Amino acid sequence: MAQDIKIMNLTKSSLEALNRNQMLSKKSSRKILKICMYAILTFAMCGVVLICLTAMSNSDGSLTQSGSHNQSGSLKGLSSTPGDGEILNKAEIETLRFIFSNYPHGNRDPTGDDVEKPADAALPNEEDQKVKIADAGKHIKLMKQYNEIVADMSEDNKEQLAKMLRELLKKKINERKKKREDPNGNNEEGKEVINISVPSFNYKRVSANQDDSDDEEEVSVAQIEGLFVNLKYASKFFNFMNKYKRSYKDINEQMEKYKNFKMNYLKIKKHNETNQMYKMKVNQFSDYSKKDFESYFRKLLPIPDHLKKKYVVPFSSMNNGKGKNVVTSSSGANLLADVPEILDYREKGIVHEPKDQGLCGSCWAFASVGNVECMYAKEHNKTILTLSEQEVVDCSKLNFGCDGGHPFYSFIYAIENGICMGDDYKYKAMDNLFCLNYRCKNKVTLSSVGGVKENELIRALNEVGPVSVNVGVTDDFSFYGGGIFNGTCTEELNHSVLLVGYGQVQSSKIFQEKNAYDDASGVTKKGALSYPSKADDGIQYYWIIKNSWSKFWGENGFMRISRNKEGDNVFCGIGVEVFYPIL
């Protein structure tokens, strides 16, 4: 037995191949499981619909009789409070209706003539009158802030804001109750007070526990200002929800996402106040938690050695067309002797505008398919085709669809099968159960795959064209909004992008020249932002990468990311795994 084990060739590549076979079998099992689940869900839904139709036909009369009672007791659109199963009571509904319907249109002083006063009310003394005037001025100022926040809100957003406001207040009340409890578990004041306050309107609800006293707790201006801080961030959150079409399953998830958004928003704001190399901005990742980022960015698949030997043609730099490899020094000086300082394939008209992979983990498909599009345009007089990422997601058996993959395996699929036109096989941002490449009328095929080492990147870009690279992404990378990224990365490669060029710029001109690519005109913008020159104003070197997070991310869908002069420092992993298609 020992002799048999020695004979077996358990090399690293063999183990990786064995691991891949196991992963492929799991993928097949998952597809079978999905089919079974869809079948079960279909039968279940049919049964539910049948039951509902039967129940509706039997209860038409009872629903008609009870309709008037339901309308008087609740407000449509306001969901139940999470956890207690109770609808908002009538007083709370009227309060929220007043705040989000009447208040924004009002501009009244709470001390005005429309405030009802007792007939026998005592005349205020001079000191009380001054305090009231000061409070009224503060209230008017806060009222203007409120109007600015909710001016552009739709009715749905105001309704959602009401829900969130209630949850925030409820949370603060629970915290206050815990602070007031003595060691024996008794409340010191024996009551719970909910304050919903805006200028010109104070609402107080007192819920007595043991004490039947109707004493009310006055609302301070500081409490009102704290409320407006929450309104400000909530307003930004709802703008984010509308822009990126976010919808959450319930108020609990919405509150959790709001918490993530506020934390990320403050991080972005703090970063932009200090960093001079790159800026962050709110984007589709702004409601992500650390756990969400870890789930979205998964480690790319490994490549066994035997597949590299079978398919990869190592890049061989040509020296003056003589077909000899360039001999490079440790500094890379000879390698870069005759290359330009700046190269941008967007300006050469062969780079498609960035697409959007959505919530599907298919970055590897977009990087590889985009690479094929560039190479085809380079060799066919700048004819840019739109090829199908969805075909590669569904049909490449060596990849795992939305669960991850690698550009290298996409190139292998293109060698063996070709890649379909995008119009024939449109992107769905999800795994189809079956490969549907029978739809394809025309395809682009490859002959082989090229491989590049980290110290050959600059020359390969000049001689070959754009190449596919893998990077280690963090939340810093995800929030990129412009400039030259030099933030934190991971050693684990978890995202694929397309490298389309490189450049250099003085530090003081990062946001002034060559800053953001204008996809409408096909030229670089100038003069967007500028910072004062520094005494030690050095040169900043960068790569230009095309991402797959839509043209609204980063600099119109692209990123400038830091590098050293030779381009071999593998910052963020650029240079560790580099491949390109050979037509």
Curated annotation (Swiss-Prot):
Task: Quote the function comment for this protein.
Answer: Cysteine protease.
Biased segments, Polar residues type: 62-82
As recorded, the propeptide runs across: 1-338
Could you tell me which species this protein originates from?
Answer: Plasmodium vivax (strain Salvador I)
An MF annotation (GO) of this entry: cysteine-type peptidase activity
Q: Tell me what gene encodes this.
A: VX1
Could you tell me what this protein is called?
Vivapain-1
According to its UniProt record, the EC number is 3.4.22.-
Q: Where is the composition biased (Basic and acidic residues)?
A: 106-119
